[in-house]
């Protein structure tokens, strides 16, 4: 109830019911067309939703492949390495709806990283992870952000990603 998810939805353009301005370069977000938002989200902003928004009837691999097929960005071998590191390689063919929320969070992070981005926005990314998996997820995310020269925006309440934050803001 502090507005963290709402803040994220302003940044990625899912909500426009705010005062003030959100600018991309010098363009006001409220003035972007649907097509411009699609392009922005496909190539510049990746978003890991708090509620994940995975397709429960699809497998873990299919959920990631949908994004990767749209962007053609990551090599399949890289994605499978991330599945392995995050302990969900044995779930590639499992339906998302049959996986725990923590397993789903790991799959959703892999999906979020399966595209180019200037910023990755992650909303409560480790709420259902143990410390080991949270650390692995943070490492994968930061390595990929560094590789792409991208920024990272993280929201959390309670469980925080252990990162070397440049700036923090409390809402």
What are these regions (language model features)?
Residues 76-91:
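Conserved ABC ATPase "signature" region
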Residues 29-46:
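ABC ATPase NBD coupling module
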Residues 20-29:
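Conserved ABC transporter NBD signature motif
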